[in-house]
UniProtKB/Swiss-Prot annotation:
Belongs to the PqqB family. The keyword Transport applies. This is Coenzyme PQQ synthesis protein B. It comes from Rhodopseudomonas palustris (strain BisB5). The keyword Transport applies. Keywords: PQQ biosynthesis, Transport. GO terms for biological process: pyrroloquinoline quinone biosynthetic process. May be involved in the transport of PQQ or its precursor to the periplasm.
Length: 308
C-alpha cells in the first residue's frame, strides 16, 4: 500500500509570500487555513520509511507538521526520511537539503545535471557525503531507492523529461552539468511494487505533449503543476513581467491549459501542486476554484494524504 503526503502545495515563496500584498497573500496573512508551504511531497511503500520529492525551503516546518516524518519514540537521533528525489535544481526544490545536515543518513537521487549544480555550490558540502550519498538517475531508466541500511524500498521510480526550463538562477550562465535540455525538468512515475499502483508527479511542466498524455492516461493519481491560472497572471496582477510559459509552467486554464489538456485521460484523482500565490484558485470561494473542482481537480491543503 503506497502512501503519498503533500507536505507543501505552494510554488516558490509560499502562501503568503513574506513580501507580497496581492489579494491571495493578504487573505492568507489573515486566515491560517489558506496558508501553504513550498512544494514538496513524501511517498512510502510501508508507512515507516519515506522518500521526499524535492526538499522545500520550508522542510523543517513541514516535518514538524507531519507526524509520519517525526523521529521514532525512544531514539535520540532518527528520521523516517530515507532519501530525497529531486525533479529539478530550482531553489525551492533543493534549499531544504540544508535543513538535513545534522548527521542522519539518507540518499539524494537526481539527474547528473542537478547533482553537478549541488557539487558546484560549496554550501551543500554541509551534507557529509559519508552519510548523504548522491546517486545519479537517468531518464526513462527504472530504479528502486534503498533505505539507509541498503534494504530495497518497495518503490520503483522512473524519471522522465518534461517540457520546461533550467533553474532561473543559472539563466545566462554555463550550467555545471551541461546545457542540454534533458534533466532540467523531470516528472516521476512511482510504482508500489507490491500492488502495481502508480502515481505521476510533475511539479513543473511547460506543456502537455502527446507522449505525456499517453503516460498519464488512466492513472490512479496525478500531482501536476498548478503554478498559474492564466499564462499572463503575474503581468496582469502587476506582480512580475514573465508569463507562466516563460517560467516553464503551463497555465491551468485556457484551450491549451492543463485542465483542458488532461481532461479526457480518465485520471482517477488529480491534484494541483506548486501553486503560485498569485493564483486565485487558492481561494475556496473563487470562480477559478469552482471551475477547477468542476473539472475534477483538487487544490490540496498541506498535509493532504492519499493512500493507494
Amino acid at each position: 500500500m503506497m502512501r503519498v503526503v503533500v507536505l507543501g502545495a505552494a510554488a516558490g515563496g509560499g502562501v503568503p509570500q513574506w513580501n507580497c500584498g496581492c489579494s491571495v497573500c493578504r487573505a492568507a496573512f489573515a486566515d491560517r487555513d489558506l496558508r501553504r508551504t513550498q512544494a514538496s511531497m513524501a511517498v512510502s511503500a510501508d508507512g515507516d520509511h519515506w522518500f521526499l520529492i524535492n526538499a522545500s525551503p520550508d522542510l523543517r516546518q513541514q516535518v514538524i507538521a507531519t507526524p509520519q516524518l517525526h523521529p521514532k519514540p525512544g531514539a535520540l537521533r532518527h528520521s523516517p526520511i530515507a532519501g530525497v528525489i529531486l525533479t529539478n535544481g530550482e531553489v525551492d526544490a533543493v534549499a531544504g537539503l540544508l535543513s538535513m545536515r545534522e548527521g542522519s543518513p539518507f540518499a539524494i537521487y537526481a539527474h547528473a545535471k542537478v547533482l553537478a549544480i549541488l557539487k558546484a555550490n560549496s554550501i551543500f558540502n554541509v551534507l557529509n557525503e559519508k552519510l548523504v550519498s548522491r546517486r545519479p538517475i537517468e531518464t526513462d531508466q527504472r530504479f528502486e531507492p534503498t533505505l539507509p541500511d541498503g534494504t530495497l524500498s518497495g518503490l520503483d521510480v522512473v524519471a522522465f523529461s518534461v517540457p520546461g526550463k533550467g533553474a532561473w538562477y543559472l539563466e545566462g550562465q554555463a550550467h555545471p552539468g551541461g546545457d542540454a535540455a534533458d534533466g532540467d525538468t523531470l516528472g516521476l512515475t512511482i510504482t508500489d511494487k507490491a500492488t502495481g499502483q502508480s502515481i505521476h508527479v510533475l511539479t513543473a511542466c511547460a506543456r502537455v505533449t502527446d507522449d505525456l498524455k499517453a503516460r498519464l492516461a488512466g492513472a490512479p493519481l496525478v500531482l501536476f503543476d498548478g503554478t498559474v491560472w492564466r499564462d499572463d497572471e503575474l503581468i496582469t496582477a502587476g506582480l512580475g513581467h514573465k508569463t507562466g510559459q516563460a517560467m516553464g509552467h503551463i497555465a491551468m486554464s485556457g484551450d491549451e491549459g492543463a485542465i483542458a489538456a488532461l481532461g479526457d485521460l480518465d485520471i482517477a484523482r488529480k491534484l494541483f501542486v506548486h501553486i503560485n500565490n498569485s493564483n486565485p484558485v487558492l481561494l475556496s470561494c473563487s470562480a477559478e476554484r469552482e471551475a477547477a473542482e468542476r473539472a475534477g481537480w483538487q487544490v490540496p491543503a498541506d498535509g493532504t494524504e492519499v493512500t493507494l
